[in-house]
Amino acid sequence: MNLNKYIDHTLLKPQATEEDIKKICKEAKEYNFASVCVNTCYTSLVSKELEGTDVTTCVVVGFPLGATTTETKAFEAKQAIEQGAGEVDMVINVGALKSKKYDYVKKDIEAVVEAAKGKALVKVILENCLLEKEEIVKACELSKEAGADFVKTSTGFSTGGAKVEDVKLMRETVGPDMGVKASGAVRTKEDAEAVIAAGANRIGASSSIAIVEGTKSENAGY
């Protein structure tokens, strides 16, 4: 199985330098990954580095807590898209979901979807490790209703990452027409193949090269 185009080559650590970002862009071009996923302050840099390739600039919005206001998320997405982002991974408002404020959660997602319309894909990070199974299902349903393109397991910055059973549940809930992204704790070729078999069609990883080469990863976390 060719895993390269499944992978969003990711660097979200706060201590990442410009040189680190340029390095992952170079790797993404060399290995022809799907995208490079970074914090929004690096959108312009990554877009410039990836110019003329089919590797997309992917950014995270409302990251990692999802607790910024809806207007803030929409602005962050809009600005990043103007700077060249083709994919936006936004974090759901976990507290609002747990408070059963479903209308708020849906509108929060819709605002980012609206900002991205026709210009960028939107992936909704659910942060499954903080959710009960029924909350994962509800979050998937709300994301689909809001018009998002993908649901995503995790930020990689909380208490857990992608689990095969969660990916399976997400795929069953959203059906065949929506993307499912597994991120956090996907560090080996075997991990990647397991989440793909469960229904993922995108993977967020910092261990991307180890995954495609079938070697041992030195990266913990994402």
UniProtKB/Swiss-Prot annotation:
Main location: cytoplasm
Listed GO CC annotations: cytoplasm
Keyword hit for Lyase: yes
This protein's pathway: Carbohydrate degradation; 2-deoxy-D-ribose 1-phosphate degradation; D-glyceraldehyde 3-phosphate and acetaldehyde from 2-deoxy-alpha-D-ribose 1-phosphate: step 2/2
Enzyme class: lyase
EC number assigned by the record: 4.1.2.4
Organism superkingdom: Bacteria
Reaction(s) catalysed (UniProt annotation): 2-deoxy-D-ribose 5-phosphate = D-glyceraldehyde 3-phosphate + acetaldehyde
Cell compartment(s), UniProt: Cytoplasm
Residues the record marks as active site: D89, K152, K181
One Pfam family this sequence matches: DeoC
InterPro entries according to UniProt: Aldolase_TIM, DeoC, DeoC/FbaB/LacD_aldolase, DeoC_typeI
HAMAP family: DeoC_type1
Function: Catalyzes a reversible aldol reaction between acetaldehyde and D-glyceraldehyde 3-phosphate to generate 2-deoxy-D-ribose 5-phosphate.
Listed NCBIfam families: deoC
Protein's name in the database: Deoxyribose-phosphate aldolase
